[in-house]
Amino acid sequence: MFAIICMNSLNCNRNGRISSRASLICLHTLSLVSFSFLANITCKSSSLTPAGIIESIPVVFTAVVSVLRCLIEEVLVTVSVVLFKISLGAIPKILRKVLVLYIILYYIILY
């Protein structure tokens, strides 16, 4: 529970809202995995043995992969926005409008 509170405080902006969709996904993924990891440890009597620890590895691996996917998505979105802002100066107005509509439709379909 402490890790969830820490992640929530790290991902909130000044208004107390989650700063981005990817951060929200990461927060939910971490909370879900931490609860399932704790349930896996507390529900099994043999969980403190090496076999119980080995059974918990897929849960931890899933958490790490999910968080890495969220972070990679966040970096890709940031890079695409920066490149889009840089390229606006070199594109005529008509193509600029088409590009803006394309990006808006892309994010609507993506989410």
From Swiss-Prot:
Its main location: membrane. Partially overlaps PGD1. It is found in: Membrane. One of its GO terms (cellular component) is membrane. The chain crosses the membrane at residues 22-42, 48-68, 75-95. It is a multi-pass membrane protein. Keywords: Membrane, Transmembrane, Transmembrane helix. It comes from Saccharomyces cerevisiae (strain ATCC 204508 / S288c) (Baker's yeast). This is Putative uncharacterized protein YGL024W.
